[in-house]
């Protein structure tokens, strides 16, 4: 089971990148106890103090989900393992149709959310995987697009093959190759079911990895407080405004570090627990 080490973590995310900002900035933990204060050292040349990025550590698991605005359909559900010491994010996709006995119901993850909301979805995900979920974050379609627009309105993804889909609620046409998809197209990318559930989850996992890798930037770290205030109103989470605290140091470390590993999908809950 992936647990918090020393009771502290710093995690700034986007859903699709969004949770990186919210979860880290509102964790309610004391950042200084976890990573210490930035040290100062002399350069030896100018004699001016130079800020040394502190070490960050801790592990946690987060549930990320996205669904329809009417709350009837769960488009995406995933567990994200955050390892701050390794500066890595591991993603395990959950099947919304997976049947789980949680609480008083034995129904699919999607039904757990529809009937019991995000809190019951979190409980069901824990029962399904055996992994403790430290925080959850859910966004509906409208919030998903708003958050991505706030964070730059685009992710670079590799489209593996041509997509030419015309459905009742949306149309998605993409040529193969690497390209930037805006917020509207990314939502269609998440919802598109072509190729079956496995192909859909492959696309969703690629988007989540891209969000973690592309949206933790120095500019976003600099504007984190303003971004947080916009984003927090667009999501459903077990994080409250009272949790909000300035964890800018950890975001700066992730944004400036040259040691970050590329985010990766794992094939099983057991693999996520080992990360």
Q: What does each of the following model-derived ranges do?
A:
Residues 2-275:
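Non-catalytic, solvent-exposed segments at the cell envelope interface
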